[in-house]
Amino acid sequence: SRNVGPNIDSWSEFQPLGVVAGITPFNFPVMVPMWMFPLAIVCGNTFILKPSERDPSSTLYIAQLLKEAGLPDGVMNVVNGDKEAVDVLLSDERIKAVSFVGSTPIAEYIYATANANGKRCQALGGAKNHAIVMPDADIDNAVNQLLGAAFGSSGERCMALSVAVTVGDETADALVSKMSNVM
């Protein structure tokens, strides 16, 4: 900004951190990395992606597509492995920041270990969603949607529904009655 005051200009400069890493879960092997590496790379960083050892293939395919699209070598990197690979990412002084999505106990471990090693850390664990059922809701449809949201993919989603809030006693009674017939 220019002229924010008499003879005063103001501006902000943002500097890349350097090498940053993302540790991703098995249940969203493409979506969660897509939250991480594009922003890191656009901000001028290089990125190390450590996918779940259960399903690394899609991550390798993403890296291949980025290379084919012209991303320079070394900008997007994939490291496979288990906890040992994670611990290297958390302790290597060249890595300045770590992002994680997964279970709460692992998020706590990653957050504590990354911070103990002086890294910036974003550790998202155990996220669940809530649903609100309004008095004018179609109860049959609400039951179907709630069951799908809670138990779809066997509940192995961080967005799985864990709480349904009903507005009004009549709504709650109707929902419980319909649910008890379904289950």
Task: Please state what every model-predicted region is.
Residues 1-37, 71:
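N-terminal Rossmann NAD(P)-binding subdomain characteristic of aldehyde/semialdehyde dehydrogenases
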Residues 49, 78, 100-102, 121-125:
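General beta-strand structural signal in soluble alpha/beta enzymes
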Residues 38, 97-101:
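Periplasmic-binding protein-like
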Residues 1-7, 79-81, 145-146:
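Short gly/ser/thr-rich secondary-structure transition/capping motifs
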Residues 20, 27, 80-88, 102-109:
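Beta-loop-alpha module in the N-terminal Rossmann-like domain of NAD(P)-dependent dehydrogenases
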Residues 22, 33-86:
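PLP-dependent aminotransferase-like
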Residues 105-183:
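ALDH superfamily catalytic-core signature
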Residues 9-10, 77-96:
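A structured beta-alpha segment of the ubiquitous adenosine-cofactor-binding alpha/beta core
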